From Swiss-Prot:
A GO molecular-function descriptor: oxidoreductase activity, acting on NAD(P)H, quinone or similar compound as acceptor
Function according to Swiss-Prot or TrEMBL: NQR complex catalyzes the reduction of ubiquinone-1 to ubiquinol by two successive reactions, coupled with the transport of Na(+) ions from the cytoplasm to the periplasm. NqrA to NqrE are probably involved in the second step, the conversion of ubisemiquinone to ubiquinol.
Reactions performed catalytically: a ubiquinone + n Na(+)(in) + NADH + H(+) = a ubiquinol + n Na(+)(out) + NAD(+)
Subunit organization: Composed of six subunits; NqrA, NqrB, NqrC, NqrD, NqrE and NqrF.
PANTHER family assigned: ELECTRON TRANSPORT COMPLEX PROTEIN RNFE, NA(+)-TRANSLOCATING NADH-QUINONE REDUCTASE SUBUNIT D
TM regions (residue ranges): 42-62, 72-92, 103-123, 131-151, 178-198
InterPro entries with a match to the protein in the record: NqrD, NqrDE/RnfAE
Membrane topology label: Multi-pass membrane protein
Official protein name in the record: Na(+)-translocating NADH-quinone reductase subunit D
Organism: Aliivibrio fischeri (strain ATCC 700601 / ES114)
Amino acid sequence: MASAKDIKKSILAPVLDNNPIALQVLGVCSALAVTTKLETAFVMTLAVMFVTALSNLFVSLIRNHMPNSVRIIVQMAIIASLVIVVDQVLKAYLYDISKQLSVFVSLIITNCIVMGRAEAFAMKSAPFPSFIDGIGNGLGYGFVLMTVAFFRELLGSGKLFGVEVLPLVSNGGWYQPNGLMLLAPSAFFLIGFMIWAIRILKPEQVEAKE
């Protein structure tokens, strides 16, 4: 049974020490696409966390009964089933957000973070640590998404979670929204800035020169 210290490490390490986006540069496409609003970024975070945690759990449970030759196919079948569940739940209860997220919910199937943790961790670990690892990597993914979405929504529309925070010129205020922040390139540069800032704080993450 994993100790409380191991659980804490598994949950917190992917946030800064081994972030799937900032360090491993995985899952960047969705990070560019769904971060125009905090609302969509938050829902995407929950979706990826749900799929990663449960796919890790199920893969770990059957890892000793899975032929090596078909393990990738089995992993993808598990992940695809979970993504279908998420997609249907969003369409049933959060239809507007589901429309905004568009195809990116379905593309969780191809998210390198989900497949990577199933193959690299769940195939070699017990079910509970695998489940916790999935939650931790979902949080690490969400940390980047929420940070990027915070600046994009605030500077791009003057709002947070759809609520006006900066007085807009159109409403007699002083802030003119920066439309550039709502375009995908702004997310690319914000993620790049985050990677730079994290590696300033943690120089051990800088790749060694060849």
